[in-house]
Amino acid sequence: MQGLLKVAHRIDALNELVGRWVYWLVLIVVLESAGNAIVRKLFNSSSNALLEMQWYLFSAVFLLCAGWTLLRNEHVRIDIIQGRLSAKAQAWIDVFGTVFFLMPMVAIFIWLSWPWFLRTYQEHEISGSAGGLILWPARLLVPIGFMLLALQGFSELVKRVAFLAGKGPDPIKRHDAHAAEQELVEEIRRMAEGKS
């Protein structure tokens, strides 16, 4: 079990690193969206490539941060019932959901998206829009994002089984302290203090 927990912690570190880098793409998406709107309104000009880059980045945020979101226990769930249960009952529900819903769904998405990406890459497919971008980078995000989610699902499964076996702490409890938004604000403050 200790070996699996070490693997789980490495997966956690990977998704934490990816999440901390990728959530800065939100700022880039906002700036690009604002820039596109300003250029379109002031200069009556538009670029399909810039519009497509906007959805590439937006897709990257959601797909690449799916594992990080699972790590932080921030995915949408129905807490009305589960929140009233004991920690062990919650862990059992998570184990069941991971084994019978999350992992099969992720496996199907990886299985379907990998050939979709490969075909696009091998055929050098580009967008049908005039001035559009190549499609394979956006399509590569799908299997990578679901692979990160699968890895994190495995990590969460290991941590919950360890908790149920009495060999690890409650993995849900550690995420109740700070929301992701609070941590982002704290990180921005630390960066600002470091520059002054």
Give the ranges of each region predicted by the language model.
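Alpha-helical transmembrane segments and membrane-interface helix-loop junctions
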Residues: 1-196
